[in-house]
Amino acid sequence: DNHINQWLEKTDFKSDKQKILCSIRNQVLQDCMSKGSELPPGIYTLTVPTGGGKTTASLGFALRHAIQSKMKRIIYVIPYTSIIDQNAEVFRSILGEKNVLEHHSGILYDLTEDKAENEAAYRKALATENWDMPVIVTTVVQFFESLYANRSSKCRKLHNMANSVIIFD
């Protein structure tokens, strides 16, 4: 809640049209956060028109639902890397860099890099192998390869998928 409230306070709404749209987005966000606290684990859908604030609303739902259901992480499964880049940037602006892992074919973290030289890159490289971060943003391919692969390197993420809020966008 703190991260989302701070982000809302920093957001500047200039025009009246933006204020109206942002008011609607805020209502969608508040409704999703409320439901995230109330609903038991299950399968849910969120249908909102384009530009209606699904990205932040789904994050609000997921955060509340993870806390209420004592889940360890949130995994976003998205079909296109361009959308992953965009959503991961939004999540980082709200939750901070250290809480969001972006994992797709266009992002490579080097585990051979000197740990002392670049601690953040080394930490992300390790987290990519087993998805050990609070929020993971990944492709459909990465997600299903982790479920169905016959190579241990691909299956290292499997245990961290359990007890997670998983969102298919």
Where do the model's predicted regions map?
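N-terminal helicase ATP-binding lobe
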Residues: 1-169
